[in-house]
Amino acid sequence: MKFRNNLTLYLIFIIVFTIYISLTISIPLKNGKFWHITDTHYDFMYIEGGDEDKQCREVTYKSKYEKGGASSIGNYKCDTSFELLQSSFEYMVKHEEKPDFIIWTGDDPPHLGNSQLNETLVLQSITNMTNLIKGYFPDIPIFPSIGNHDSYPQHQIGVGPNWLFENVAQLWSPFLSNDSIETFKLGGYYTELVSEGFRIISLNTVFYYNENRQCLNLTDPAGQLLWLNETLANASLAGERVWIIGHVPPGYNEKYDVFNFHKQFNDEYLFSFSQYSDIIEFHIYGHEHTDTFRLFYDDPNDHINDIEPTGIMFLSPSLTPWMNQFLPALPNNPGLRLYEYNITSFALLDYYQFWTNLTDNIISGNIDWQLEYRATEFFNTFNLSPVSMYEAYLLIQSVTSQLLKFHFYNSVSYPTKGCDEICKKIQLCSIRHPFTKGFKECLVEI
């Protein structure tokens, strides 16, 4: 009898254990997700009926009686209206209410001249956006970066301590550690250990921006690159995986035909990552308002021998549809991006690019957000690793229809006039050659 009871218990244990193992094996780990918010440029003085030639901030005779004023939804010559801003956050919450965290890469104030701004207005813009994100995503970790418009005068950010770093550090103190607050006060940069084995480094790339005159005579503003090297070295010793985030990306801006960084900073910045490409998963930036990516190498000469890249940068499009009327660039439709990553390896798996057609919205009177494309489907890749994105680049390079579609997505499906040979060269070379020398050689080769 005792033997029979023991046998019964043993069989029950085997059955339960088998069921447990089968369930464990059959149920895959859920992938992590995060929103990337960038270049919102909310204009709190945007008014319905405003004159687009006056940034939609005032009603004029022309806007009232002749040409017609701006829609309450938005205008391609103006920054983000409240209606557009509100709809974007409502859509994000509806689509993915509980992301693991939010990456927010700056540029909150509207595109205004210094005569229309001051320190108080700039800080109020950053405060408004901070409160908005926290309000829609309470208890969700936020990892921010400072942008070139998050300053006064515009684009001018020098070494701290200064009014900007001091005030923003206090504003962001609820989601930054004490160590992060200290380095932010010094230079607007920091690092956070998100979880065991997973680190985010937020860099202040405005130091190197081509319109920032405050750091031209400095070799390493606020010691950021030295600190970066030490942080990456420690991360490597600890066996951590690293993500790099910032506002202004290095390399060539295909929209404005200019390098984003001052010449002396561009290559030095890229070289800072070469020794640690084995632990850096990817970079995320904003600033250009366009949808694109950048490949880079440990050695800038590696592209000559078709060696596969060791790094990848993703540039997300802006929420603002604003068009620079003084430079040869198209506007873009508003965009939002949701990334997907492996919660074990912290590798980037995919992203979902959402958009809204501002032209149609103005006609209908409703804002309709929808999926524009899924990255792995459009690029025909398994994931978003540097090697996979190199394959995506080769597809764009070799298949004309893919290039034209990529160029269309570059401005978030805003109608373009196509992409001629010069356009093709700039698009392809800016993707593959963020180093200055390689880019110039590429323009001749293609």
From Swiss-Prot:
Q: Name one GO molecular function term.
A: sphingomyelin phosphodiesterase activity
Cofactor remark = Binds 2 Zn(2+) per subunit.
User: What protein is this chain from?
Assistant: Sphingomyelinase phosphodiesterase C
Query: Which biological process annotations from GO are given for this protein?
Result: ceramide biosynthetic process; sphingomyelin catabolic process
Q: Does the keyword Secreted apply?
A: yes
Q: Which cofactor does it need?
A: Zn(2+)
Disulphide linkage map: C56-C78, C429-C442
Name the gene behind this protein: sgmC
Q: What class of enzyme is it?
A: hydrolase
Keyword Kinase attributed = no
Compartment list: Secreted
Q: What is one term from the GO cellular component aspect held by the record? A: extracellular space
Glycan attachment residues as annotated in the record? N6, N118, N128, N178, N217, N229, N234, N342, N357
Q: Which Gene3D superfamilies is this protein grouped with?
A: 3.60.21.10
| Family stated for the protein in its record | Belongs to the acid sphingomyelinase family.
In this chain, Zn(2+) 1 is annotated as bound at: D39, H41, D107, H289
Sorted alphabetically, the keyword list is:
Disulfide bond, Glycoprotein, Glycosidase, Hydrolase, Metal-binding, Secreted, Signal, Zinc
Q: Which SUPFAM superfamilies match?
A: Metallo-dependent phosphatases (SSF56300)
Matches recorded under InterPro entries: ASM-like_Pdiesterase_prd, ASM_C, ASMase/PPN1_MPP, Calcineurin-like_PHP_ApaH, Metallo-depent_PP-like
Q: Which residues bind Zn(2+) 2?
A: D107, N148, H247, H287
EC number(s) recorded for this UniProt protein: 3.1.4.-
Kindly indicate where the leader peptide sits in this chain.
1-26
